[in-house]
């Protein structure tokens, strides 16, 4: 087992990574209080039940699987369920699932009674390597991803790698995009490991831990995304636009993969294309580039007509460039061959 510690001025917490951790979750989390367990219909129910079995008093609430559950409507329904469970400010929410459950669960915890504790138990590769740590919580509104939210750090994170054994191959592939993202901007050796060996049962925990160490370092330096943390948006500026344009046809990680391709130097793009293909991620997918770019204008990363885009000039390094919307559109269209 690996234990990392996120060290922040106001709230530090441990991140536990290993096999078989879920069955003894009470060794890592304080569950000696009321525990509201949030999961979704795509997550094997036994994961939530393991948390319940280790809790003093718990209830499991299941939301529908998918991005549509990251909404204010679903949020209101869950808040009412928390209220009906008579939760106090001393009680805790445990999010058991992927990025949707973690994002919604964290935002619920941030807003219920002005803030309660929550623990993250990510069960997808994407959430394990990225979204489960760092404190970003949000829901979608009006077709815009993560536009309503708050920074609310978890009390702890438990990553049981055994949960990945039940994931479909496509979801594993989608999650691997976030590990590639971390490697491209910050860890040349990690990229070469994935490039040469892929992601296998033998190197899975190492890749998760190395990706988490990158994000941990970045968040500790810039918790509220005033500077350095923007590098974690690599692939997401255009990726979010593609995701909105395709309306659930593609997974988030697949859109990030497509979004990364055109933000690299040509020689990096060649190697990245090969890696994405090896991992089972799309490198050539039909989407309406104009519609995708329109969504970019409304993204959080676009402020006052300026898009802050992350580029990778060589593997393990990054550049943050401020471009006008028109400059960004022209660049993307040139690189995708649209003009």
Predicted regions and their residues:
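A glycine/threonine-rich phosphate-anchoring loop and its flanking beta-alpha core
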Residues: 14-16, 107-199
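C-terminal charged capping/lid subdomain of soluble metabolic enzymes
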Residues: 177-179, 269-339
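Short glycine/serine/threonine-rich phosphate/pyrophosphate-binding segments
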Residues: 100-107, 128, 240-241
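Non-catalytic interfacial helical region
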Residues: 79-96, 105-120, 130
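ATP/NTP phosphate-donor binding region
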Residues: 1-92
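Glycine-rich beta-strand-to-loop/alpha-helix junction loops that act as flexible
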Residues: 65-66, 96-98, 234-235
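Residue-level signal for inorganic ion chemistry
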Residues: 18, 37, 122, 160, ...
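Active-site segments that bind and position negatively charged phosphate/pyrophosphate groups
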Residues: 193-291
């Amino acid at each position: 087992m690996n234990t990392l510690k996120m060290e922040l001025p106001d709230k530090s917490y441990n991140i536990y990574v290993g096999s078989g951790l879920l069955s003894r979750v009470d060794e890592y989390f304080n569950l000696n209080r009321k525990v509201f367990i949030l999961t979704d219909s795509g997550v094997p129910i036994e994961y939530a039940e393991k948390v319940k079995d280790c809790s003093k008093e718990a209830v499991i609430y299941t939301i529908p699987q998918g991005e549509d559950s990251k909404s204010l409507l679903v949020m209101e329904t869950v808040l009412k369920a928390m209220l009906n469970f008579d939760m106090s400010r001393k009680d805790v929410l445990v999010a058991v699932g992927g990025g949707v459950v973690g994002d919604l669960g964290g935002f619920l915890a941030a807003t219920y009674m002005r803030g309660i504790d929550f623990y993250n138990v990510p069960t997808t590769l994407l959430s394990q390597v990225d979204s489960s740590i760092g404190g970003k919580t949000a829901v979608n509104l009006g077709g815009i991803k993560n536009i309503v939210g708050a920074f609310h750090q978890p009390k702890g994170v438990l990553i049981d790698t055994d949960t990945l054994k039940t994931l479909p191959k496509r979801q594993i592939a989608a999650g691997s995009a976030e590990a590639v993202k971390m490697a491209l901007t910050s860890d040349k050796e990690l990229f070469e490991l994935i490039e040469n060996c892929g992601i296998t049962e033998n190197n899975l925990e190492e890749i998760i831990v190395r990706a988490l160490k990158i994000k941990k370092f970045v968040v500790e330096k810039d918790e509220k995304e005033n500077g350095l943390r923007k590098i974690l948006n690599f692939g997401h500026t255009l990726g979010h636009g593609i995701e909105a344009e395709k309306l659930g046809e593609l997974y988030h990680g697949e859109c990030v993969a497509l979004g990364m391709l055109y933000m690299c130097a040509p020689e990096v793009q060649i190697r990245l294309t090969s890696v994405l293909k090896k991992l089972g991620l799309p490198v050539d997918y039909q989407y309406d580039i104009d519609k995708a770019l329109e969504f970019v204008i409304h993204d959080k990363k676009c402020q006052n007509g300026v898009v802050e885009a992350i580029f990778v000039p060589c593997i393990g390094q990054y550049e943050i460039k401020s471009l006008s919307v028109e400059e960004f559109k022209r660049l993307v269209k040139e690189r995708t061959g649209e003009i």
